[in-house]
């Protein structure tokens, strides 16, 4: 069965430190401890508290995709590291231990994202990325911190993807996935 093969491959190929951090941060911190704290904070503050926070560290992007809003904003909308840190710190006080990042292209800020992962190693971080800024150093840093995962987007096969995102982007993304 294809799903069983996928799960076995995932278990076989995932770095043990990354698997441990995922289990601890999503399984214990977010699902168990976080949920308990969220329920308490909902009563204290008399409002809904989400189980994750979605944030855009930057509006900047290294691509200029046809029809994308990011090119209209340029590189001027950025949360500082201190602002990102404050969001996570306040979120943890409410019981939130899962943070998703979009953009722009969040990996334009990969040094700050890794720094955030190091500082808040009890949290899980996930970035939606075009994949073109994934390099060996980032992969090594992700393996070291263990609490950052990526979703890499494509527009379809090479012709459709490169028509919208630019020539050669499809190949860069496939290389990043290796």
Task: List where the protein language model places each region.
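N-terminal [4Fe-4S]-dependent radical SAM core
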Residues: 2-54
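Canonical Radical SAM [4Fe-4S] cluster-binding loop centered on the CxxxCxxC motif
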Residues: 46-48, 52-82
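Radical SAM/AdoMet-radical enzyme domain recognition
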Residues: 81-101, 109-178
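A broad, low-specificity signal for short, low-complexity segments enriched in glycine/proline
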Residues: 12-19, 26-29, 61-62, 87, ...
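A generic structural signal for short
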Residues: 42-43, 53, 75-76, 126-127, ...
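N-terminal start-of-chain detector that recognizes signal peptides
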Residues: 24-30, 71, 97-99, 121-124
